[in-house]
Design a protein with these regions (language model features):
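Donor nucleotide-sugar binding loop of glycosyltransferases
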Residues: 16-19, 42, 95
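A conserved acidic beta->alpha catalytic loop
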Residues: 39-47
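A short, conserved beta-strand element in the Rossmann-like catalytic core
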Residues: 41, 65, 93
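Short hydrophobic beta-strand elements that form part
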Residues: 8-12, 59
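Short, well-formed alpha-helical segments that are part of the catalytic scaffolds
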Residues: 14-29
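Hydrophobic helical membrane-anchoring modules
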Residues: 1-3, 149, 173-263
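Acceptor/aglycone-binding surface of glycosyltransferases and processive sugar-polymer synthases
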Residues: 60-79, 84, 96-179, 206-215, ...
């Protein structure tokens, strides 16, 4: 546990039956207070496994998409008093053991957002990332950095940590329900002056790891460029106004009220 902070891990799941248990097994329980798994209408045993593992399990009755899944993740995390929310893909592509490092970056007060980068340690290709995806990742990142005035190593990681303030300030409901949601979050956060930090994260690419096909990758790339252009650095900064209605905004947790992770 992190003093004075309730840490909640959220797992946006879709057909994750083969990797969910391995992912959860490596999440550091001495750091995480609760784990939420949101299933996006999977047709496999993801839900049954999540419940067997004792996770807080939310099930969509229809597929809402990757971004739609994350919206539910963050809403549920805030509703149980999360101060720090760490989003981790449950496909075992990223190392769950680094969750504590990401949460500590947020708890330090130096960063509002922390990213687990596959590029910093040059582990993407070594871990099996297809060459065309690596080239596209690097190319998109260069353009995004130029447009929004950042020096991030990548914008496309599925391993992220946020402060409560970030999640309450960004207009998440207006963002895409597709994969470009991740970039919309980061660009909107930069435009509001939130500080972003990174750590290197080794990754694994294998048959069960989630991925998108070439056609959707092209659509995603175009969406990323459009998002960066809309939030380019010459555009005016936006205020950090809480967009969540007051009646839906639960109070931040207090240390004495912290609940431990259910077995």
């Amino acid at each position: 546990m992190i003093e004075h902070s309730r840490v909640v891990a959220v797992l946006p799941a879709y057909h994750a039956e083969k990797t969910l248990e391995r992912t959860v097994a490596e999440i550091p329980r001495d750091i995480v207070d609760d784990i939420i798994c949101v299933d996006d209408a999977s047709r496999d045993d993801t839900v049954a496994i999540a419940k067997r593992l004792g996770l807080r399990t939310i099930v969509h009755d229809r597929n809402l998409g990757y971004g739609g899944n994350q919206k539910t993740c963050y809403r549920e995390a805030l509703s149980i008093g999360a101060d720090i929310v760490v989003m981790l893909h449950p496909d075992y592509q990223y190392s769950p053991r680094l969750l504590g490092a990401l949460a500590q970056m947020i708890a330090s007060g130096h960063y509002d957002i922390a990213l687990g980068s596959r590029v910093l340690a040059q582990s993407a290709l070594a871990g099996g990332m297809p060459l065309y995806k690596y080239i596209a990742n690097r190319g998109l990142t260069v353009v995004e950095n130029l447009l929004i005035g950042q020096k991030l190593s990548e914008y496309h990681t599925g391993y992220r940590a946020f402060t409560r303030e970030v999640l309450e300030s960004l207009p998440l409901a207006t963002f895409s329900n597709d994969f470009v949601f991740d970039n919309e979050m980061l660009c909107a956060a930069v435009r509001r002056g939130f500080a972003i930090g990174e750590i290197s994260c080794p990754t694994r690419y294998f048959a069960e790891a989630s991925s998108i096909n070439f056609r959707r990758s092209v659509r995603y790339g175009l969406g990323v460029l459009g998002t960066a252009w809309q939030n380019a650095r010459w555009r005016p900064r936006l205020p950090r106004e809480r967009v969540m209605p007051a009646e839906q905004r639960p109070p931040a947790s207090r240390p004495a009220a912290r609940a431990s992770q259910r077995p």
